[in-house]
Amino acid sequence: MADETDRHFDVQEKIRKYEEFLDQRLAKDLEAVFKSQDEIVAKITEYTQLKSSIEQIQKTDLKGKDLRSRVDLGCNFFCQASVPDPSRIFIAVGYGFFVEFTLSEALNFIEKKLAHLQHSVDKLGKDAAKIKAHMKLVLGGLQELQGLNQLSHRMHYPV
């Protein structure tokens, strides 16, 4: 009888550890992957909008003319701006650094950056799939342990 009670407590302890691993580790890892993926998708959107704006500037052919535009100062607060030479553009490349590009150089940079960001999103998608597979595996283990636990109760206490 004591041996059966010990086995029951061992199973309950294993169930608790599996549930803890599922909640504390796998679920948080999956949440972090989704958050990173969302941040990268936001960057992709920004670079795509920038690419579209540069292409529009190239189409209008503003050689020798000022470009008038609205600039977002933050929190969707805009002001009017006048750009005396719209043939060059500064792009934030990370870590607080800006690089001056010609419009064609900027488009080339953006294409490479978009490819890199898309690769990162794809990798994070694969990471999320792996974490989900691990979660499924742990859930299967939990179901098996709980099934064994219920089976042992049925064996000792017939209905």
Swiss-Prot record:
**What is an example of a GO molecular function annotated in this UniProt entry?**
transcription corepressor activity
Protein name from the UniProt record: Protein UXT homolog
Tell me the Gene3D superfamilies matching this sequence.
Answer: 1.10.287.370
Give the record's GO CC terms: chromatin; mediator complex
| InterPro entries found in the cross-reference section | Prefoldin (IPR009053), Prefoldin_subunit_alpha (IPR004127), UXT (IPR003994)
State the Gene Ontology BP annotations: negative regulation of transcription by RNA polymerase II
Say which family it is in: Belongs to the UXT family.
Q: Which Pfam families match?
A: Prefoldin
